[in-house]
Amino acid sequence: MTVVLVHGNPETDAIWGPLVDALGRDDVVRLSPPGFGAPLPDNFPATYLAYRDWLEGELEKIGDPIDLVGHDAGGCHVVNAMMHRPELVHTWATDAIGIFVPAYVWHDLICKPICQGAG
């Protein structure tokens, strides 16, 4: 079973270092969303659908049963992908489920693209 970790904004996959060390496993994959710890391709539209499709594509490449974990904006991508393609994983968890509460307040670094309708 592969563990896949998706970090948020403005982090890099280094945020998962202590957890990966504690797990003591060699089947952990740390994914960095385009533009957040990974290069942003010129033609990548950076919309919530584009990030969903990116994550689904990465999960398809792994192929093994997957336990998926998302944090912050990475957790938003996890929820979006799992609502669309739940069969891609064995289990999933996120700390970002609160984004579905109408009164949720986005932090400043993620609010710019989302709150202005760009993402």
Where are these predicted regions, by residue range?
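Short, flexible active-site-adjacent loop segments at beta-strand->alpha-helix junctions, enriched
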Residues: 9-10, 72, 98-99
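Active-site signature of alpha/beta-hydrolase-fold catalytic machinery across serine-
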Residues: 18, 80-84
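Active-site loop/oxyanion-hole signature of alpha/beta-hydrolase fold enzymes
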Residues: 30-69, 100-102, 110
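Flexible "cap/lid" loop of the alpha/beta hydrolase fold
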Residues: 83, 90-119
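Structural signature of beta-strand start/N-cap positions in the alpha/beta core
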Residues: 2, 27, 64-67, 88-91
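Conserved HGGG/HGGXW glycine-rich cap/lid loop of the alpha/beta-hydrolase fold
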Residues: 1-39
